[in-house]
Amino acid sequence: MTAALLPRVGIGVDVHPFSPDRPLWLAGLHWPGEPGLAGHSDADVVIHALCNALLSAAGLGDLGTQFGTAEPEWRDAAGTRLLTETVRLVRDAGYAVGNAAVQLLGERPKLRERRTEAEQLLTETVGAPIALSAATTDGLGFLGRRDGLAAVATALVFPAR
């Protein structure tokens, strides 16, 4: 197999502090009754980490490169809009998404009740299987103090034929 045909892997990370005056969006879903996250767009850490992983795998940089905070059209943008545009950029660069996995890090909200719903939404948006998991830091650090949320993602892309 030549290097041009090898799959590529990307890693993405995103972190946002809580902002109680904003709605919480995670994995493209609204979480009523939970404090939101501060950010230029909707601050959906799950989708932002996924976008970073996809962009990294395709050699396209990261969210800041593609959707910078200096660009007003991305102000308060929905994570699903960013993800749809990211997938378009990845495809335009000549890649197809194989799959991705995202892990949400934080004490709350609890993902388990909405995991299937979130995975379905992400999978439909990307057009490839997306797995979602969660972990806590057992009370350690800013995540353990409930100051914010983080997410880490990996993505696999293949050259489109």
UniProtKB/Swiss-Prot annotation:
It comes from Acidothermus cellulolyticus (strain ATCC 43068 / DSM 8971 / 11B). Its cofactor is a divalent metal cation. Belongs to the IspF family. InterPro entries: MECDP_synthase (IPR003526), MECDP_synthase_CS (IPR020555), MECDP_synthase_sf (IPR036571). This is 2-C-methyl-D-erythritol 2,4-cyclodiphosphate synthase. Homotrimer. It catalyses: 4-CDP-2-C-methyl-D-erythritol 2-phosphate = 2-C-methyl-D-erythritol 2,4-cyclic diphosphate + CMP. Binds 1 divalent metal cation per subunit. A divalent metal cation binds at residues 14, 16, 48. Coiled coil: none annotated. Keywords: Isoprene biosynthesis, Lyase, Metal-binding. One of its GO terms (biological process) is isopentenyl diphosphate biosynthetic process, methylerythritol 4-phosphate pathway. NCBIfam families: ispF. The record marks 40, 136 as: Transition state stabilizer. GO terms for molecular function: 2-C-methyl-D-erythritol 2,4-cyclodiphosphate synthase activity; metal ion binding. Involved in the biosynthesis of isopentenyl diphosphate (IPP) and dimethylallyl diphosphate (DMAPP), two major building blocks of isoprenoid compounds. Catalyzes the conversion of 4-diphosphocytidyl-2-C-methyl-D-erythritol 2-phosphate (CDP-ME2P) to 2-C-methyl-D-erythritol 2,4-cyclodiphosphate (ME-CPP) with a corresponding release of cytidine 5-monophosphate (CMP). Pathway: Isoprenoid biosynthesis; isopentenyl diphosphate biosynthesis via DXP pathway; isopentenyl diphosphate from 1-deoxy-D-xylulose 5-phosphate: step 4/6. 4-CDP-2-C-methyl-D-erythritol 2-phosphate binds at residues 14-16, 40-41, 62-64, 142, 145. It comes from the Bacteria. Its EC number is 4.6.1.12.
